Design a protein with these regions (language model features):
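Feature activates predominantly on carbohydrate-active enzymes
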Residues: 1-86, 100-103
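Catalytic-core regions of glycoside hydrolase
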Residues: 9, 93, 103, 112-257
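Generic structural signal for well-ordered alpha-helices
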Residues: 20, 24-25, 61-66, 90-95, ...
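Conserved, mostly hydrophobic/aromatic
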Residues: 27, 97, 107, 128, ...
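N-terminal cationic-hydrophobic initiation segments that often serve targeting/anchoring roles
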Residues: 28, 65, 69, 98, ...
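Residues that line or immediately flank small-molecule/substrate-binding pockets and catalytic motifs
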Residues: 39, 109, 239
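Active-site-adjacent "subsite" loops/lids of carbohydrate-active enzymes
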Residues: 74-116, 219-222
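C-terminal functional modules
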Residues: 257-305
Length: 305
């Protein structure tokens, strides 16, 4: 199955299920088909993977899954088994979500700063795949961007082991040259020459603000080569946690992917962006270097505040 859609995979405020349903509806409207649930702030997916969600949360999740199914959107779950001794708890968590209709699971080993071992990770991954042969799994390595390879000797050794030993038929996530890449195309995979393009799933953090909360990247996907996203079996855009912005991003993604004739300005107006701010919208595009005059700064301040 070709998966194109979004990731709820950022640090920060977790949206409500009603807000998630709106994202699902927008994905469906644009012919996009995938929503990965993997918020960093959900402790039951990461640090406390051995503890179940509450019954009330699970009821809301069941309703969310039913809505997604009605909209022909698949929901995947991202699980981060930080501790090796939690493999049985991980299996139990997967079984619980599988019983609720989830077929796609991402096993995430990102953002681990110490005591990480590729061979321990792949052992866990294989154990999970062996346990659930009828489900779909992919993998996120600890080194998931080009800039992380040379972070230190441990990261260098990890990437060497990953490059040599990760099964070539399996799918894994990559964010490009940077954790937040401002250019995305075939050159974003230059460190992955030994892997097929279809094995490299993209986790696109361009719009994500959790690691840089005072900065918002916004453009009509002009950082992304259309032939690149179209060549992918899995391309997911990470959202921001800001509901209006996230709905705007989904609208832009759908229009860009389908190459619709809808203009950037039309989409911005549809989502209630002030016409005066649209005149200055390139301020949010990192490719465009803008030197603001004082009167422009004053104008933007009046619009925003």
């Amino acid at each position: 199955m070709k998966r194109v859609g979004i990731v709820e995979g950022y640090y920060g405020k977790i949206p409500t299920f009603e807000q998630r349903k709106k994202i699902i509806s927008s994905l469906s409207e644009h012919g996009l088909n995938f929503y990965m649930y993997a918020p960093k702030e959900d402790p039951f997916l990461r640090l406390n993977i051995d503890i179940d969600h509450t019954e009330n949360w699970l009821r809301e999740f069941d309703d969310f899954i039913a809505h997604a199914q009605n909209m022909s959107v698949e929901v995947g779950i991202g699980l981060a088994p930080i501790y090796k001794n939690k493999t049985e708890a991980l299996k139990s968590k997967i079984q619980n979500f599988s019983d609720r209709g989830v077929k796609f699971f991402s096993i995430l080993f990102d953002d681990i700063e110490e005591n990480f071992s590729f061979f321990d990770q792949i052992e866990t991954y294989r154990a999970i795949k062996d346990k659930f042969p009828n489900l779909y799994f992919d993998f996120c390595p600890t080194v998931y961007a080009g800039e992380l390879i040379d972070k230190n000797s441990a990261h260098q050794e990890y990437f060497k082991e990953f490059n040599n030993s990760f099964p070539k038929h399996e799918v894994f996530f990559w964010t490009g040259e940077k954790v937040i890449s401002e250019k995305m195309g075939i050159s974003s995979q230059e460190h992955l020459q030994d892997f097929a393009n279809t094995s490299i799933a993209i986790w696109d953090n361009y719009f994500t603000v959790d690691s840089c909360p005072k900065k918002l990247n916004l453009s009509f996907f002009d950082y992304l080569q259309h032939e690149f996203i179209f060549s992918k079996d899995c391309y997911l855009v990470n959202l921001t946690g800001m509901p209006r912005t996230d709905n705007l991003i989904v609208d832009m993604l759908g229009s860009f992917y389908a190459q619709k004739e809808t203009s950037y300005e039309e989409i911005l107006l549809k989502h209630g962006v002030d016409e005066r701010l649209i005149e200055q919208i390139n301020l949010f595009n990192p490719k465009v270097k803008v030197n603001l005059k004082k009167e422009d700064k004053d104008k933007i301040h009046k619009i925003m505040f």
